[in-house]
Amino acid sequence: ILGPNGFEWLPFSDFIVSYPGILIAFIFASLPFSSKDFVLKTGGRRAGEIGTYSSIAVLWQWGLGTLFALAVLSFIWPELHPGFGTLLAAGFVGGHGTAAAIGSTFMDRGWDEAQSLAMISATVGILCSIVGGMLWIRWGSQKGVTNFITPFKDLPDELRTGLIPENKRESVGSETVSPLAIDPIIFHFAIIASAAVIGYYIGIWSSDLMSDYRIPTFSLAFLVAILLKWGLKTFRGYQYIDQKISLRLCGSFTDLLVVFGITSIQIPLLIKYAFPLFGLFIVGILICWALFFYLGPIVFRENWFEKSLYTWGWVTGIMAIAIALLRIVDAKNKANILSDFAVAYFAIGPLEVLLVTLAPVLIMNGYQWGFSIVTLGAGILLLLIILFLKMRMAAECNPQDPGKPHQITDIRSE
C-alpha cells in the first residue's frame, strides 16, 4: 500500500518486479540443503502426482477459459477479440510474466488492449490466490484435514502470536565453520547462491540453444543444488553444511519473496476494467475450486490438502503466494512439496511454454475453436487416465470392497 504502486511513500527500486523471480531461484537452491534426500521410489511418485494435477489445472484453464469466452461471452459482447478467453490462463496460471508475453504477442498482431487486460488478469489472480488460499486454510483447519496445523483456537500461543516463550525456543543452527574465517550464515548463503547463479547461467545457455524456450531458473537451481550436495557428500564436505541454517535461510528468502511479490502489484490496474472480465474470472475460480475440492483428494495419496493448497496458490496467482500459503500450513516443510514440485516442473514447464507459444498463433489464424477443444480434451483425457489408475489401484488394495468411496466424501458432506 505504501509502495510505488500505492501511495508512493516508499521509494522502491524500479526493478522490484524482478525480485520475486530472483528469490524463487534462491529458495529452490536451498531446498536440497534444508530437507531430506529425495528418494526416487517415493519422491518420483509424489512428483508425478503433483505434476499431473498441475497439468490438468493448466490445460483446463486454457481450454475452458477460451471455450467459455467463445461460446458465452462473445454472444453478450460480440466485439470481443477471439483470444479474450486466453487472458484467464495468461493471468492466473501464468502470472505477470506470462501475461506480458501473451499480451505483447497479441499486440504485435493488432490487439492493442491485450497487454493491459492480461496484466489485470494476473493482478486479480493474485488477489484470488491470497483470499481464496486463506479461506481454504480456515476451512481445512476447521474440518481437520490439515496435517501440520490445528484449528486456530487450539493452537499454542507461540503459533497464534508468533512470539516463542523462552522455555520453547530452539537453536537456529550450529557453527560448522569458524567465525574467524567466515561467518557460518554467510558460508551457507554462498553455497546456496552458487547453485542459484550457476542455474541462472545454464538457463541463459539453454535459451541460446532453444531460441523460443528457456528452462526455468528455479528448476535449474534446484538441480544444480542436488548435484552440489552430491559432490559435497562424495568428497566428505557435506558434514560442514547445517540443515537448520539452510532451512532458516530458505525461510528468509521466502519472507522477502512474499513482501516484494505483493509490493509489485499494480493497484490501478484492478479498477480499470470490470466486464466481461468478471465473468471470465468467475469461471477461472470455479475451475480451481473444483480441482481443489474434488480432484485433490483423489490424486494425492498423502498430504492432499497441503498439495492442493500449494497448487491453488500458483495456478491462480504466482509462485510467491503459493509458497506463502504453504508456509502457513507446512512451516517446517515436512511434506517436501517444494522439492516434488521442482522435479515435476520439468514436465509442466514445457507444457506451459508450448501453450503460450501456440495459443496466439493459432487464434490469430482462426483456429480458436480447435485450440480450445483440443486443450480441454487433453485435460479431460488426463483426468480420465488418473481416475482409471486410482480405481484400479483401489481395487487391488481393497479387493473385498473396490467401490468404497473416498474418505473425503464425509468431510465434504459435513
Language model: regions and residue ranges:
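Hydrophobic transmembrane alpha-helices of secondary-active transporters
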Residues: I1-N5, S13-R45, L223-L232, R248-I271, ...
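Flexible hinge motifs at transmembrane-helix junctions and intramembrane kinks/re-entrant loops
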Residues: G6, S18, A71, Y200-K244
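Structural signature of hydrophobic alpha-helical transmembrane segments
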Residues: S13-F28, P82-A89, D212-V224, L249, ...
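Entry/N-cap segments of selected transmembrane alpha helices
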Residues: P20, D37-L70, F189, R248, ...
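Juxtamembrane helix-boundary/capping and inter-helix hinge elements in multi-pass membrane proteins
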Residues: S34-G48, L73-P82, S104-S116, S141-T150, ...
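Intrinsically disordered, low-complexity non-transmembrane regions of multi-pass membrane transporters
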Residues: W139-I186, K233-Q239, M391-E414
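C-terminal transmembrane helix pair
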Residues: F260, I267, F281-R392
